[in-house]
Amino acid sequence: MVKIFDADLIKGHFIVNDNGKRALVDTGCPYIINDENKYSKPHGELYLNDARSNVDPTISEFRGLEYFAQHKVLFDYKKAAIIVADQGDDVAPVHPVAEFAISGLPERIFINLAIEGKVRKMVFDTGASIANYLTESIAKTGTPCGTVEDFHPQKGKFPVDLFSLPVEVGGETVDIPFGVQPTDIDRDVQMSGAVGVIGVGLYKNFQVLVDLPNKRLVLGRY
């Protein structure tokens, strides 16, 4: 079965109404978290309350990688839509340009991206809806391009200086802004073996298919 959901894009986050739940669809969260199970999931109450405080108070569910494990999910930011297909059904970007192998499951989605001419291991996180991130020594080699305010469940709100770096995708180069996360959050990312987190930098520029059953991520031109 294939379902098409109209998404509310709030602060760049994809939020859908499905089966009586208002769900924030987030590849950066390993779990499905709601009021029924929030005390049994690591940091469950914290993450759910943070989403309600900083994104939308009507959110009833964090829909993370537990959900993606059995589905193929296509994010279309320009149409404000999410297409969800069961494991045996087909869904794909209209104009695919690049495919990446996924590792890191079930906790995270890791992909290898060529950033500034070097292959970097990155976390793909649709929850990174305001800024993408790289460790400081890499990010600050880019061109300064502004400042935004972001938030994190464990840190609250914080300012982020952005630096533009070239990212190679399917034979073309896209300039994407990256910031530097607070030190302890960046340390957690580095301990996972990655050097950064990317979300909005991909899905604003490309349709993104997250196909966990086949451990692949596919980008397509809008």
Give the role of each language-model region.
Residues M1-Y222:
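Pepsin/retropepsin-fold aspartyl endopeptidases
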